[in-house]
Every structure is written in C-alpha cells, then in structure tokens.
Amino acid sequence: MQASDPIPPQLGVPFATSYAALTVAAVTLLAALLVHELSAYSKRRSMPPGPFRWPLIGNALQMPQIHPWLTFSRWARVYGDIFYLDALGQHIVVINSATVARELLDRRSSIYSGRPHLTMVGDLAGYDRMIVMQPYGDELRQQRRLISQTLSTSTIGQYYDIQEAAARRLVLGVIDDPSSLEGQIKMNIASIIMLVTYGYTVKGTEDVFFGRAIEIMDNLTLAARPGVWLADMIPQLKYFPSWMPGLSSLKAAEAWRKLLHTTNGMVYQWCKENSENGTAHLPNLCASVLAQAEGKATLQLEESLMWAALTVLSGGLDTNISTILSFILAMLHYPDVQKKAQAEIDAVVGSGRLPQISDKSSLPYIRSVIAESYRWLPATPLSVPHALDEDDIYDGSFLPKGSIIMPNVWHMLHDPKIYPEPDAFKPERYGGSDIEMKKVTDIAFGFGRRACPGFYFAEGTIFSIVVTVLATCDIVPVVNDHGQEIIPDIRYSTNVVLCPEDVKCTFRPRSEQAKSALIDSMTGVL
C-alpha cells in the first residue's frame, strides 16, 4: 500500500489566530487608552472652577506677586469657596471658606497634612527639618510632642513671669525712645522665646544670639517666598555650582544654610551645658526634655529637640511681631477702641497694680481686641500651604494628588457675609463671646495636624504685651516739625508672614504712677 503524501503544516490557522489576537490586543489597548484619557478629561472637567488656563503654562502668568491673598479673595467672589489653578503643571487648590478648610484640612487630615517641596527654602537654605517645612511623618510628630508637652495649657503658667517682665521692659523702652518701637518689640519677644526655649537671657539689641535669631527669621521669610526663586521652578538647579552666571541665589542660600546650622548647634549646645551647670534659666524647653530622658537621650532625640526649639524661636518671632505691630496700628487708627479697652482695665484691675496674665478671664474686651487683631491683619494670610497626598473628591470636584492646598486665611477672616465691614477694626463684633473669638483663632493659627503647637504660649505673650501697653500708656501718633500728628498708613509686606510696615508711634504714660509701677516691676527675671 502506497504511503499517503504527508499533510503540509497548516500555517494559515495559527497565523490567522495570531493576527486576530494582535487585533484584539490593539483594540483593547486603544480602548484602555481612550478610557484613561476620557477619565483624565472627566477629572479635569470635574476640578473646581477657576480662572482661564492657557495651554502648557496654565495660570502661571496670572499668579499674583504682590499680596496674592487679595487677588485670591477677588477670585473667590467669582469662583466660590474653592477654586483651582495650574502653574506650569503644578496643581494649586485655594480654599476660601472655613467650612471647606475644616472638612479637608481637619477631618481629612490624614491625606491633607503634607507640605509642598520647596527647593530654595528646604534643600538649599536648609530649613527642611523645621516643623513648618517638614513632610508629615514620625520626626514631625515627635517634634510637635516635644513642644506640646512643654508649652501646654498645664505648663505655660510657669512662664507668665517671663512674659510679663518682657512686656513691661518693652513698654519702658518705647516710652524712653519712641523710635525704638520695632526694635523693642523684636528684642522683647525674642527674650521671652529664648528664655523659655533655651534658658538664654537676651542682653540687649546687640546680643549676638538675638541678632542671629532675627537674621535666621528674615532669611526664612525670604527663602520661602512663593514664585520668586528659579530653583523652585527648576529644582535641578540645586546641583549646579553657585558661581555660574545667573545663579547668585544659590550662593545666598549657602550663606543662609551656614548661619542656620551653625547658630542652631551653638544655641542648643549653650543651653545643654548651661542648664547642667545652673547658669541657664530653668525651666526651659530643651532642659526639660533632656531631664525627662534621664541621661538616655539618643542622638535622634537631641536632633529632633534642636530643630523643635528652633521652630519655636523662628516661628514664634515673626508671627508675634506681626500681631503686636497690627495691634498698635489699629490703636492709632481706632482711638475709641483704645479708650474702651483702657476703661475695662481700669474697672477690673484698677490703678494700684499692673495687669497680669491671670487677669485675662476677667477682661473680655481685651480678649476681643486681641482676636480682632488676629482677624484684621492675620499674620499668615495664606497660612502655610499643605500638600495633598492622594486623589480626593470634594463636593463633586476632583482634587488631584500632589496639589498644593492654600488656605486663604485672609478671605476667611474678611468675608463680609461672616464679618460685616471686614476692613474695620471692631472688637464689638464678638459680643464678648469666647466661642466667636475662637472661630478666629482656629483659622489664624492653622489647621488639622499642622495647627500651631505653641498657640497657648503665644497667646500669653500677646495678651501680656497688649494689656500692659493699654494699662500704662496711651498709644498716640508721632508729631512732625509742624506739630501735625502723623498716623501711619495701613501698609504691609508681601511675605509668608504679613508684617505692617513703617509703624511709628509714641507710648505716652497715662500717669506718673503708671510709669513708676513699670520701673518698680523690673526684676531679675530678664
């Protein structure tokens, strides 16, 4: 029997199958890409409203450089409580309502507690380990604990004598030399913070550590300015040598970093050595933490403590200075408020003694004046930006991961629907209610896990200065050569911390008895 011819391989079937499979795969891939693009487009369409965005650059050319909170407030009247900006691909979400801020930054704080990465202030100038700049994590939580356990409501009473002594020295200094107003405010607030934090006594305006502290604060303010530094827009520049043309900012950052790290180590080491030998004032934050460690403080704990202490110093300095200057400016523009506040002090405290922080609960109008100072010219009008760690949805709007979240504190505290005549300084708007005042401080001192850990300590400093000034002096305008009173304009800087500019006045003692009481109260605390 003849063998049958071999059957040729059936090449056509597998080829057809492979072609069909490739076609299905290609169609599936295209469909997936289409779905992805449609989803991305849908997300983009569902983002919060905002100003028109140009292709590629978005809103980069529209971003305000001067007093951005005012521009954002105007946009809020058009786009609502939350709006979206795109600056060269960087997502920015601006929150203009306390209700929205509470929902996102408080209730959803697990994903809204990050910080945007800023190359200039962090990588280059070296402020990245301070609480205000750190991403949310273990070290930040540890630093906040170290501050909170020393400056809590149960412990701050031990520092009242320091705050009161500095307030009285401040007033005497301005009485003697009105031109020293800003210098006296800076020196005495620094004295309070450095004594409480490090046990270090500031010896005067020429004190080396005081001078370095002010310089560190000023450098932080410069380095953190948004939209100013090329390195923040092109982070790769941090790897370039500072001698290259056009990169002089890198050289400045090197100097800022050196000053920061050198001073941080020096003042911490001073505290450690002098707390042990009894030279430093006790208690102080650093010494208290080290004492609790009972000689077993790790290097990691000491580094966290060193940066936590520096945060209290630099973070407390500029915001407290801002608030006191705002208060003084308000008293110059609203003398009737000043008279009413003085009348309350006279009725409650009398003229036989100087007011104390312990009088605070009996002085609701003074508390209202302070709350109104926080509201009228908030120290941080855009707070400090948060960063969103995950995609999120709010009220049907898509908020993308990596967004910079900017709480527009200025608008929240100047919304005419909540605060009628928002540009007017009116302590009466609170009706003496601490609940209403707390609504202001809850906004002015930050949100969620990023709220100021030194709030109660700062309150004592501000109250002590405000009540001491009002009890003993009239805040009056300076007089020019023609006998005309010069009331300073309401002008302020464009920085992370708003600070009134060119505030000049005279502290005129209300009586010789008041001035004598100030002089007699000077003790060895400072």
Swiss-Prot record:
Can you tell me where the transmembrane regions are?
Answer: 15-35
Q: Which cofactor does it need?
A: heme
Top-rank taxon of the source lineage equals Eukaryota
The record lists glycosylation at 219, 277, 320
Membrane topology summary: Single-pass membrane protein
Cellular compartments annotated = Membrane
Regarding protein family, the annotation reads:
Belongs to the cytochrome P450 family.
Q: What is this protein called?
A: Cytochrome P450 monooxygenase 226
